[in-house]
Amino acid sequence: MTPADLAELLRGTAASVLADRGLDVSVLPETLTVERPRNPEHGDYATNIAMQVAKKVGTNPRELAGWIAEALTAADGIESAEIAGPGFLNIRLDKDAQGAIVVSVLEAGSSYGSGDSLAGKKINLEFVSANPTGPIHLGGTRWAAVGDALGRILSAQGGLVTREYYFNDHGAQIDRFSRSLIAAAKGEPAPEDGYAGAYIADIAASVLKQRPDVMELPADEQQETFRAIGVELMFTHIKQTLHDFGVDFDVYFHENSLFESGAVEKAVESLKGSGNLFHEDGAWWLKSTDYGDDKDRVVIKSDGNAAYIAGDIAYFQNKRARGFDLCIYMLGADHHGYIGRLKAAAAAFGDDPDTVEVLIGQMVNLVKDGTAVKMSKRAGTVITLDDLVEAIGVDASRYVMIRSSVDSSIDIDLDLWTKTSSENPVYYVQYAHARLSAIARNAADLGLSADASNLALLTVEQEGDLIRTIGEYPRVVSSAANLREPHRIARYLEELAGAYHRFYGACRILPQGDEDATDVHRARLALCAATRQVLANGLELLGVTAPEQM
């Protein structure tokens, strides 16, 4: 019986208790939660449901808890339900109900943990979307790892996810990029507002190789040639880097297409027609404060050029026209203002602002030998995704980016993430899977098979703790999806690995020497198989490998 199963049983029991006494069943929350007590002596799970609803039905919490406990203990799978404190319920499962968790994992296999909370929902997940003016830096690396993991998690809950990269090939940064390439081709320093670094020189050399005549072209044609070829070369490099990192996209959407197709102009005219734009100081402004933004936003500047938000507005319209129910944007720490403006733009078109979600990620810092490693894209000393992977590998790079909440900054200690010890979180989790794989191989060599028919024999404390931890996994995946928080799965996997290592230290899994195999050995092998499956499932959602040996 998983926590979700128990919560469902608990709600049904509480509803029956209230109905039998003529009390209002509607006061019960739609879904209940049960928690694992900090002290295992208090039981397997605890709930405060009696304290939540007692006052609403005119009784006291302990009395209501007593009614629920009496009814609950009569249910299959419940060993005991005891009242504690002001009205808590501490619940123990019987051994068969605990063992059923292991059976459910073995039966579900790679689908264990999947759900349907987002079934049929069309979700556009836009992430990375780095400017094609340089390699992907650490901030983009974080979004690549987190975004890809989130896409996997949303899909595991039934979401129809489209991973999208918004290719910023329109605007002043592209002009600065092309001028920087021309300067490099001439052997001159980069423009003051341009980009520098070895990659600029490399791309400039590639342009010269493809178009030996480029330096003889008129200035405007020359810049356009450097722009077109340079941007394509840079974007090809970005896509290859992401692919090597395990990240691929379903759609690469070109910002410039919004302007060339007239979509931006059409969106602006539509807003003018609806009265959601006003003219002031020679510019056109969106009345975004009418829709909850902290200030009105310039859409068309006084020089007649479109502000960046104009493209954002047209892009959102494009997404909705493609039938997406939810548009998730993953943006950097300097984009807080985009939350209000994107939601306001949606509302201005008569759309539901809740179709827009914006996740803001914080900074990533690199530390080596206790000293921060500085980065600056424009100075040409940027720390890139490729640099990080070269230093600590793909798995560690993805894991370190995912395991922290996106609203907190990360300090990546290169010394820590290259350790082959329990101090390194990804090693700790992967080692648990590798150890379990070794046990499976050794059992096969002994001709010993797992048997889930006698799981009630698993009575050691560490066995019960491991089983209960396995049972938490579906709820963790559901929470990670609904809260858009992939780090919950990484932290859970560390908890599961810890529970497994403690079990391994306390229980002999395979017979030793001339010892005969017993039903306990076979039951423990079943528990090991279930643990291995859950570790593999969780690592797959993070895009991290589950090694068979280390």
Swiss-Prot record:
It is found in: Cytoplasm. The keyword ATP-binding applies. A motif ('HIGH' region) lies at residues 130-140. One of its GO terms (biological process) is arginyl-tRNA aminoacylation. Its EC number is 6.1.1.19. One of its GO terms (cellular component) is cytoplasm. It catalyses: tRNA(Arg) + L-arginine + ATP = L-arginyl-tRNA(Arg) + AMP + diphosphate. PROSITE patterns: AA_TRNA_LIGASE_I. It is an enzyme of class 6 (ligase). Pfam families: Arg_tRNA_synt_N, DALR_1, tRNA-synt_1d. SUPFAM superfamilies: Anticodon-binding domain of a subclass of class I aminoacyl-tRNA synthetases, Arginyl-tRNA synthetase (ArgRS), N-terminal 'additional' domain, Nucleotidylyl transferase. Keywords: Aminoacyl-tRNA synthetase, ATP-binding, Cytoplasm, Ligase, Nucleotide-binding, Protein biosynthesis. InterPro entries: aa-tRNA-synth_I_CS, Arg-tRNA-ligase, Arg-tRNA-synth_N, Arg-tRNA-synth_N_sf, ArgRS_core, DALR_anticod-bd, Rossmann-like_a/b/a_fold, tRNAsynth_Ia_anticodon-bd. The keyword Protein biosynthesis applies. It comes from the Bacteria. GO terms for molecular function: arginine-tRNA ligase activity; ATP binding. Its main location: cytoplasm. Monomer. NCBIfam families: argS (TIGR00456). Belongs to the class-I aminoacyl-tRNA synthetase family. This is Arginine--tRNA ligase.
